[in-house]
């Protein structure tokens, strides 16, 4: 009889835990919950996902960079890097050690038209 009680106690100590579920199932459930929580903030971060509009403290007030969208900034940076890597534009070194790089490029027409409208509107508002 005493042997039966000890074997029953062992069974109880190795028995499933937490509402009758085995430990490995609970671990899997916990893993799934953690995984879903990692994915949920993506929807919650939609507000944060929109990048903050950058400011250009060193740029003049009438600098076009103040009016560029994220896409236009990206296009400009890509164009500048491509031009530099392919040898377009003019790169020079002054006697004081300053490096200068100057290049001209075109954005797609839709972006150019939008920028012309935005800059002409802000220029006319500044004149008033």
Curated annotation (Swiss-Prot):
Domain of life: Viruses
Keywords associated with the record: Ribonucleoprotein, RNA-binding, Viral nucleoprotein, Virion
GO cellular component: ribonucleoprotein complex; viral nucleocapsid
Location within or outside the cell: Virion
Disulfide bond residue pairs: none
InterPro entries listed in its UniProt record: Arte_nucleocap, Nucleocapsid_C
TM regions (residue ranges): none
Record carries keyword Ribonucleoprotein: yes
SUPFAM superfamilies: Nucleocapsid protein dimerization domain
Annotated GO MF terms: RNA binding
Region (Disordered): 1-60
Similarity comment: family membership: Belongs to the arteriviridae nucleocapsid family.
Protein name: Nucleoprotein
Species of provenance: Porcine reproductive and respiratory syndrome virus (isolate Pig/United States/SD 01-08/2001)
């Amino acid at each position: 009889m005493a042997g039966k009680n000890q074997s029953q106690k062992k069974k109880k100590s190795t028995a499933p835990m937490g509402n009758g579920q085995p430990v490995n199932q609970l671990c899997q459930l916990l893993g799934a919950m953690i995984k879903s929580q990692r994915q949920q903030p993506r929807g919650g971060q939609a507000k944060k996902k929109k990048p903050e509009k950058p400011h250009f403290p060193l740029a003049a007030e009438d600098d076009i960079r103040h009016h560029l969208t994220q896409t236009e900034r990206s296009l400009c940076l890509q164009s500048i890097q491509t031009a530099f890597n392919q040898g377009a534009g003019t790169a020079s070194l002054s006697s004081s050690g300053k490096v200068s790089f100057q290049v001209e490029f075109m954005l797609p027409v839709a972006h150019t038209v939008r920028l012309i409208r935005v800059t002409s509107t802000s220029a006319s508002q500044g004149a008033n």
